[in-house]
């Protein structure tokens, strides 16, 4: 679908959430590590919404509370404390986190506030034990450059990350407290982004600036992108949790398609004088002998019912595609699933099907007085769930008559989105009373400004000049998780070519990961020991791969133990010559027959025996010399 984004009035804003790599959490002194071992215990909580300073209840919080879920929090005795459990007041904010956040703000040309206030942001999905997230507003009015123009940075906040979701059991959600409180920066852009491509470029640029500090966490889940999208006559939609940079373009594009199609459906409904009948019909009797397994299973439940709602003028539109593979009926189903916890719904645009017969559909339509242009939605489950689900469908169908409802949606892996909750209102923020205002002195800002890191484009040019890296490798290295380690290794081992160090960090490690080795077990010391062994001639460069594999398998072993295990003890030049002479002697008939043309065959035999134990260039030089002597 070809879209003129200027014509449709596309506006996009980004919210980037990036974890900071600090020693302690933002409001306590627990370490910022995630654990996969068994927790020491768990507590159970129920959260309820309260009035804001304005005497209002946030609508998103109210929806969450109506679900009536319990929240189970897993904890560890040695890496979580009473602050995470909301049993102790917060400690003063981490100065390390504050410094990093201000560094990021200055790199994005922002104005830092003189006094920073901590606020509470209502969060009642259970991801915070307190029912709110603490956030500190630090800077405003900055900008970044893209190829399509400037993008304003409206705010930068320092805030605590949420607890880590482990499992949703339906009536209860399990969280681990190891992630709760890890410092992160929230960077919000102005709605200056006009195309999907520009959105991706802006997100990439912000990511590059964050990585330039060398003080942010890397890996899955450490950076999350939320995208605010709207078009003319549509509505603002917040898409949560886009983790893959390459997905941003598709998410924006598909959301524009969704809104355009919802507007077309609205226009068609208005032409038909469509109406949502606000009555729920009990149609259990019609489906009591239905062959549909879903309906059979629902009716076996205690108080199991089949009920329906009538949507006048909706026929053919409930089944209309609004995003690739998703229909208006999917929107109804998403809302019912989230609000009531049902498995889904049926609608007459897709029936008879799924074990529901034509005769049953006919009886259904007669019972609710549906005409040819009408659609009927049915849900089967426990009666209380069915009623809540159909109330949600009625609400969503009424919104279809208006156009595009404001929503918070979650990103799906295919670039589509699904309903998550209503868009939060302004009533969700109020002051944090346990933390005094933070005075940010000019001297403190100037000290940080004087020590700002190189921006990626500056480092790129320096890497090409100083380390003789080509454009592709320099670009990879600048954005690499290992960029600081790369420079340290180059300084320590000057007789090792920087190109070899760079290709090892950006190429070799990925190769061995693809082979199934857990490179997360590799620490900086393992790589340093590997290059030290190379520098001292203990191994040849061909042995680097096997050494690193060895450290993945035995991370607690020393370099000498790894060399012993892998059979990679380096050989002297004399020992190499002796082995090559033996190989030539063994294949003398080939040498006599082919002369110097036997080189390729012999080199293969030599490297099979000497790989990792002797430098390939040394083997090559000795072999050629010996062949000439024959």
Swiss-Prot record:
Belongs to the GatB/GatE family. GatE subfamily. It comes from the Archaea. Keywords: ATP-binding, Ligase, Nucleotide-binding, Protein biosynthesis. It catalyses: L-glutamyl-tRNA(Gln) + L-glutamine + ATP + H2O = L-glutaminyl-tRNA(Gln) + L-glutamate + ADP + phosphate + H(+). The gene is gatE. Allows the formation of correctly charged Gln-tRNA(Gln) through the transamidation of misacylated Glu-tRNA(Gln) in organisms which lack glutaminyl-tRNA synthetase. The reaction takes place in the presence of glutamine and ATP through an activated gamma-phospho-Glu-tRNA(Gln). The GatDE system is specific for glutamate and does not act on aspartate. PROSITE patterns: GATB (PS01234). Its EC number is 6.3.5.-. One of its GO terms (biological process) is translation. This is Glutamyl-tRNA(Gln) amidotransferase subunit E. Heterodimer of GatD and GatE. Pfam families: GAD, GatB_N, GatB_Yqey. One of its GO terms (cellular component) is cytoplasm.
């Amino acid at each position: 679908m070809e879209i003129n984004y200027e014509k449709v009035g596309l506006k996009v804003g980004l919210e980037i959430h990036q974890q900071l790599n600090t020693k302690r959490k933002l409001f306590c002194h627990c370490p910022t590590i995630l654990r996969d071992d068994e927790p020491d215990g768990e507590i159970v909580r129920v959260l309820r919404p309260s009035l804001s300073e304005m005497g209002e209840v946030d609508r998103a919080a109210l929806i969450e509370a109506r679900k009536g879920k319990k929240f189970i929090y897993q904890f560890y005795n040695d890496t979580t404390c009473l602050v995470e459990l909301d049993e102790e007041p917060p400690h003063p904010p981490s100065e390390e986190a504050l410094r990093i956040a201000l560094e990021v703000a200055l790199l994005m040309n922002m104005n830092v506030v003189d006094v920073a206030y901590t606020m509470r942001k209502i969060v009642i999905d259970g991801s915070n034990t307190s029912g709110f997230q603490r956030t500190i507003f630090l800077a405003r009015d900055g900008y970044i450059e893209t190829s399509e123009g400037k993008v304003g940075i409206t705010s930068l906040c320092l805030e605590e990350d949420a607890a880590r979701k482990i499992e949703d059991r339906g009536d209860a959600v399990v969280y681990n407290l190891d992630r709760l409180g890890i410092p992160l920066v929230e960077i919000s852009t102005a709605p200056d982004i006009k195309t999907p491509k520009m959105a991706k470029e802006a997100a990439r640029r912000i990511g590059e600036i964050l990585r330039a500090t060398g003080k942010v966490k890397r890996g899955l889940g450490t950076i999350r992108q939320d995208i605010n999208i709207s078009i003319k006559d549509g509505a603002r939609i917040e898409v949560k949790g886009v983790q893959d940079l390459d997905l941003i373009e598709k998410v924006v594009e598909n959301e524009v398609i969704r809104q355009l199609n919802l507007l077309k459906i609205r226009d068609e409904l208005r032409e038909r004088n469509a109406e949502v009948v606000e009555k729920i019909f009990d149609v259990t009797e019609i489906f009591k002998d239905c062959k549909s397994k879903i309906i059979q299973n629902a009716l076996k439940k205690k108080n199991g019912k089949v009920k329906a709602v009538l949507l006048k003028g909706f026929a053919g539109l409930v089944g209309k595609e609004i995003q690739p593979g998703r229909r208006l009926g999917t929107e109804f189903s998403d809302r019912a699933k989230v609000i009531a916890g049902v498995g889904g719904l049926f609608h007459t645009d897709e029936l008879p099907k799924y074990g529901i017969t034509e005769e049953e559909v006919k009886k259904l339509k007669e019972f609710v007085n549906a005409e040819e242009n009408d659609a009927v939605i049915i849900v089967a489950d426990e009666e209380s769930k069915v009623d809540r689900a159909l109330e949600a469908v009625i609400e969503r169908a009424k919104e279809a008559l208006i156009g595009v409802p404001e929503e918070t949606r979650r990103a799906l892996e295919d670039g589509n989105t699904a309903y998550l909750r209503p868009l939060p209102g302004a009533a969700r923020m109020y002051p944090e009373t346990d933390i005094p205002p933070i005075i940010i002195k000019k001297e403190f800002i100037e000290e940080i400004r004087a020590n700002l890191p190189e921006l990626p484009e500056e480092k790129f040019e320096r890497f090409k000049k100083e380390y003789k890296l080509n454009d592709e490798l320099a670009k990879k290295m600048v954005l690499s998780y290992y960029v600081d380690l790369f420079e340290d290794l180059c300084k320590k081992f000057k007789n090792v070519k920087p190109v070899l160090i760079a290709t090892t960090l950006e190429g070799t490690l990925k190769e061995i990961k693809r082979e199934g080795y857990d490179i997360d077990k590799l620490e900086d010391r393992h790589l340093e020991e590997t290059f030290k062994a190379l520098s001292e001639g203990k191994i040849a460069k061909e042995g680097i791969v096997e050494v690193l594999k060895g450290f993945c398998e035995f991370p607690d072993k020393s370099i000498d133990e790894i060399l012993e295990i892998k059979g990679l003890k380096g050989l002297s030049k004399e020992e190499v010559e002796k082995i090559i002479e033996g190989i030539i002697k063994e294949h003398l008939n080939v040498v006599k027959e082919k002369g110097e043309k036997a080189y390729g065959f012999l080199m293969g035999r030599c490297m099979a025996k000497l790989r990792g134990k002797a430098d390939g260039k040394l083997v090559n030089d000795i072999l050629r010399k010996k062949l000439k002597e024959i």
